[in-house]
């Protein structure tokens, strides 16, 4: 057994001298492997009398366990040392300036839409949407727009065939709403619309917001008061507003609304009017009982006026130098 004690002492010394996990594994193989020094000690048991073998085997197993415990402890120590060294190399200097993650921002037209939806939402209006590929009935016929009206011409409208087109206005949403809901009705209809035009103040696709109220005893006074309050809220100022007589097939009387600009000139901002009796009838609403008003405005136009943008096309060019100004 003195030889066994010597093997254990040598194994423990080798374990203590191991400087890395690989060297430590070599020690394990040398002493506890299949042909390791301590493992082979079990073969000496056959030379002992049968009654001595259990006690001798227990001593050998105890020696092997002592070496295994030392191996485990040294392995943990070596792995901890490696981890600590790695962490020391990867230590973050908290005094250094952080890498800034740049936040995105809402598109200025989206800001305008959200602002308008919030204002009218507080007045009890709900938001309704509809298809961008529209039929001629909802886009023209139901809105009292005659067959000879220039808005139906190819040079103004994108037609797919004789009855299908890219909608030129969101008014079709109003028709569907009036057919599906009973008065009182208060809705706004934001969305993309399409017209065959492209210059500094027009694009083939733009965003429009239309509003509609239908109820008993709705008057032009209600229309003027609502829009005046809206414009004051949108431009965050006590605006000078005027209503000019105009013509739209779907409203009667009709008006265009201007606000006084900072340069002392009137600026057109939207169109409006009392819903034409024919439009109410087309939607299944009795014009003898109910009346209503409607209005429509271009989101890009209002955004240009609010932020002082001079070219509408800038909203669609995705120039970050331009868009970052609105964050």
Curated annotation (Swiss-Prot):
Gene: pheS
Subcellular location: Cytoplasm
Annotated Gene Ontology cellular component terms: cytoplasm
Protein name in the entry: Phenylalanine--tRNA ligase alpha subunit
Family matches, as PROSITE patterns: AA_TRNA_LIGASE_II (PS50862)
Enzyme type, top EC level: ligase
Metal-binding as UniProt keyword: yes
Organism: Erwinia tasmaniensis (strain DSM 17950 / CFBP 7177 / CIP 109463 / NCPPB 4357 / Et1/99)
GO biological process: phenylalanyl-tRNA aminoacylation
Cofactor(s) of this protein: Mg(2+)
Family: Belongs to the class-II aminoacyl-tRNA synthetase family. Phe-tRNA synthetase alpha subunit type 1 subfamily.
């Amino acid at each position: 057994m003195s030889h066994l004690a010597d093997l254990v002492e040598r194994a423990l010394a080798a374990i203590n001298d191991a400087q890395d996990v690989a060297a430590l594994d070599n020690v394990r193989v040398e002493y506890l492997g299949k042909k390791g020094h301590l493992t082979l000690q079990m073969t000496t048991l056959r030379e002992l009398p049968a009654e001595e073998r259990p006690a001798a085997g227990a001593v050998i197993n105890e020696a092997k366990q002592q070496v295994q415990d030392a191996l485990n402890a040294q392995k943990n120590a070596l792995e901890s040392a490696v981890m600590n060294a790695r962490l020391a190399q990867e230590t973050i200097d908290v005094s250094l300036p952080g890498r800034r993650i740049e936040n995105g921002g809402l598109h200025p037209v989206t800001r305008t839409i959200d602002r308008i939806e919030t204002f009218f939402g507080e007045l009890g209006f709900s938001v309704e949407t509809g298809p961008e590929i529209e039929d001629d009935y909802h886009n023209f016929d139901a809105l009292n727009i005659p067959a000879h009206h220039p808005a139906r011409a190819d040079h103004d409208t994108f037609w797919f065939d004789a009855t299908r087109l890219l909608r030129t206005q969101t008014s079709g949403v109003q028709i569907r709403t009036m057919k599906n809901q009973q008065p009182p009705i208060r809705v706004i209809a934001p969305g993309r619309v399409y017209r065959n035009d492209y210059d500094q103040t027009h694009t083939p696709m733009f965003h429009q917001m239309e509003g509609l109220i239908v109820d008993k005893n709705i008057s032009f006074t209600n229309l003027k008061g609502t829009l005046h309050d809206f414009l004051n809220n949108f431009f965050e100022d006590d605006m000078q507003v005027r209503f000019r007589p105009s013509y739209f097939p779907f409203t009667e009387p009709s008006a265009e609304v201007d606000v006084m600009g900072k340069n002392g000139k009137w600026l057109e901002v939207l169109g409006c009017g009392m819903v034409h009796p024919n439009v109410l009838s087309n939607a299944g609403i009795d014009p003898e009982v109910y009346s209503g008003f409607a209005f429509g405005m271009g989101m890009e136009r209002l955004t240009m006026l609010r932020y002082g943008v001079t070219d509408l096309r800038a909203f669609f060019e995705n120039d970050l130098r331009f868009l970052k100004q609105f964050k």
